[in-house]
Amino acid sequence: MAAAAFCCMTMTVVFTACSDDDSNKPGGDAPKTTYKYLHYADARDNMSAEESSQYKAYCWRLERKDKLQEPKNWRTCQGELTPNEESELFPDPDYEPSLEGLRQLNISGSSDLSAKELDWVKAEIEKLTDGPIYIIDVRGESHGLINGLHVSRYGANNWGNVGKTHAQIVAEEAAEIHAIKGQTIDIYSLSKNDNYQPTESGRSVTEATSAQTEEEACTERGLGYARFTVPDRAFPGDSELEAFVEFVQKLPANAWLHFHCQAGAGRTTQYMIFYDMMRNLSVPLKDIAYRQCLLGGNYLLYDGSAPGEDPVKAELCAEKAQMIPLFYQYIQENFPTGYKTKWSQWKRQFSDK
């Protein structure tokens, strides 16, 4: 069902992937590419109610237990660059990426966070900076903290909010979380083996004595918070990208950003790459993508073409592999003007290619 629904957004032009070399020329000519995926994010953001109904969330999903511990996929830009399963996808496996500007990036990443994991992250970052700390939440799906547990509303493809605006998502999420307090709810541990369907063995009956949005939990701890609503495994919509560019421009020089999505792999890496792009204009995209992967993230220039790849994942990978280099080109060309030309306006020049 999910694969069929996603394919319905396919445009009628043919995709030609940009080469690894062409995508990494700072300020160079645009890759000679047919931009099949130019408007895919727009199509997701504007999906009709009928189309999006098949992704409707159907249960509360347990994601992080409330333990004082290092969260999954925790890393900073001061960490070691280590080969991993994702780096096996590198087209140039012997390439050593530049470290230029990397160690000076005040950013970190991880999975989502329980209340005590949020405390752990705050304490760790405070060892590294005396500046303001911002939690950068790049999840499109509704989530929050119940009794300190990190939970989310889960639907097919983890796209429970696809087609909704940023404002809708944030408002509905807060209402759902606050309505739980004092109630008894079922929270499920979901498994890939069960196709992420709720099972009796995975059910936990929970009396919600406390219920907070993530923003409320951050504010309570003196942390800044910013939300960019991006569907799982997807490239961001225009409004979310433009909001991020504007947000970064207004940050204090000594700010530290901690990015997270659900697992701390795809969307987290994507936004760490975006930040790296904006702060290190002289570094080729290839180096940025490789080093963010070797720090512990995903390799996001992978085009999904491996034999036997899941078709939905393959399409989403191909989208990112095409659109991330284009966004890199946007950053290169528009930094000198302070991004006066918005991303949505700039990319129109490629609509007829």
Question: Where do the protein language model's features map onto the residues?
Answer:
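Bacterial N-terminal signal peptides
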Residues: 3-14
